């Protein structure tokens, strides 16, 4: 299937759609030029390219599944703005914004970057709650995810710079059914975490269970 951002999501659309998506990605109305520059200045190297990739993938998923592309794209460029911070800096932001880390997050503070990024999006960029909520759960997932939550989680997993076993399958599923794609992502993530002997966040288990209860396959 490959990783052409302009064709892996929207079946039957011309590859030139990539240029249109890139044009839209640079003109998200919720995020004016000055704000966009401020956000992107916090991202470096791979994280910069990754966030732009998530923005584009989120816009495409939003257009495919009927969510607001502006909200999806904005969530995409904001989702990792605290990813570069050290574990102690993550915990400091938690203290500042009243975030109470769970036991798993205390052991793996990098998991907090979704919640701390959401806090920054809310406090510094005055983003609406649905965008902040999507950013907050983009790493772990959660029970009863909204469409915007699902789009950001999936866009983060399948964006064009991602290259790991299973990503092409996730991209294929994203063309067919967003819930099936999400369930596949959860399954892959849980399998990897178990294989590596890593802690599993309760929200990830809840997200997986929610899909199963709904009969997603």
Pin down the residues of each PLM region.
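Short, Lys/Arg-enriched N-terminal segments with co-localized hydrophobic residues
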Residues: 8-28
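Divalent metal-dependent catalytic cores for phosphoryl transfer on phosphate-bearing substrates
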Residues: 34-41, 59-184
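N-terminal glycine-rich anion-binding loops that anchor highly charged ligand groups
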Residues: 50
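Charged phosphate-binding loop/patch that engages nucleotide di/tri-phosphates or the phosphate backbone
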Residues: 191-217
């Amino acid at each position: 299937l490959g990783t052409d951002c302009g064709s892996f999501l929207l079946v039957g659309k011309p590859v030139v759609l990539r240029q249109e998506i890139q044009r839209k990605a640079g003109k998200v109305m919720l995020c004016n030029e000055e704000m966009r520059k401020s956000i992107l200045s916090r991202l470096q190297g791979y994280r910069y390219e990754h966030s732009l990739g998530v923005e584009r993938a989120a816009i495409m998923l939003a257009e495919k599944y009927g969510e607001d592309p502006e909200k999806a794209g904005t969530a995409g460029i904001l989702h990792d703005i605290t990813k570069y911070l050290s574990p102690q800096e993550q915990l400091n932001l938690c203290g500042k914004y009243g975030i109470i880390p769970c036991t798993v997050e205390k052991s793996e503070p990098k998991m907090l970057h979704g919640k701390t990024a959401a806090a920054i999006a809310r406090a510094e960029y005055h983003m609406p709650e649905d965008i902040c909520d999507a950013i907050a759960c983009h790493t772990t997932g959660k029970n009863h995810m909204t469409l915007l939550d699902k789009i950001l989680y999936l866009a983060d997993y399948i964006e064009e710079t991602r290259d790991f076993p299973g990503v092409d399958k996730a991209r294929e599923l994203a063309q067919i059914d967003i819930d099936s794609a999400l369930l596949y992502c959860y399954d892959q993530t849980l399998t990897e975490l178990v294989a590596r002997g890593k802690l599993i966040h309760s929200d990830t288990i809840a997200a997986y269970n929610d899909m199963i209860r709904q009969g997603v396959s």
